[in-house]
A protein has these predicted regions:
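DNA-recognition helix of C2H2 zinc fingers
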Residues: 140
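Terminal helix-turn-helix DNA-binding modules in bacterial transcription factors
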Residues: 60-67, 71-79, 84-85, 91-137, ...
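Short, Lys/Arg-enriched, Trp-marked, Pro/Gly-tolerant hinge/linker segments that flank
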Residues: 12-27, 31-71, 76-81, 95-100, ...
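Aromatic/histidine-rich interaction motifs
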Residues: 1-6
């Protein structure tokens, strides 16, 4: 990391082509290193997202879930990704992350949807499909339950149109 800093400082000081890209990659490297350091410092009893990433079976399941948010996941399928039995996976997931796998999936989908509502003018029905909902009305109810307001209202509020 130290040599990367020196290289980036030289590139910046001499205004070499591509310096912005170098700085962006260095920022990513520092972020990953900071996360790794935090994970390494966790106690065996630690809970939360970082603790789950330290647990290889849970990390496999989270990687699959995060990578395919629109997939119609079941606890059984996530347990298969984790290479654990359904009951062992569900208990370990809830103990480590503080909620059952399907509650986590819903929360993750709503956070993804919220980001898309902020950043994209796409219709709500399309955003619903992108995060795994076939029905806009089912998505809207789930979004309101998780985020405290329906998706259309959320978009208005975050875009300053309310």
């Amino acid at each position: 990391v130290e040599s990367s800093f020196r290289y980036a400082a030289r590139a910046y000081a001499t205004r070499q082509p591509g310096v912005q890209e170098i700085l962006a990659r260095l920022s990513e490297l520092l972020f990953v290193e900071a996360l790794r350091d935090q994970i390494d410092q966790l106690t065996p009893e630690a809970t939360g997202w970082l603790a789950a990433l330290r647990d290889p079976p849970l990390a496999r399941a989270l990687t699959a879930l995060h990578g395919r948010v629109a997939h119609a996941w079941t606890t059984e399928q996530l347990a298969e990704e984790a290479l654990l039995s359904r009951s062992t996976f569900a208990e370990r997931f809830a103990r480590t992350l503080g909620m059952p796998p399907m509650a986590y999936l819903t929360r993750w989908r709503m956070l993804n949807a919220a980001q898309r509502l902020r950043e994209s003018p796409a219709p709500i029905a399309r955003i619903a499909a992108e995060v795994g909902y076939e029905s806009e009305s089912t998505f809207s109810r789930a979004f309101a339950r998780e985020m405290g307001m329906p998706p259309g209202r959320f978009r208005q509020v975050v875009l300053g149109q309310a």
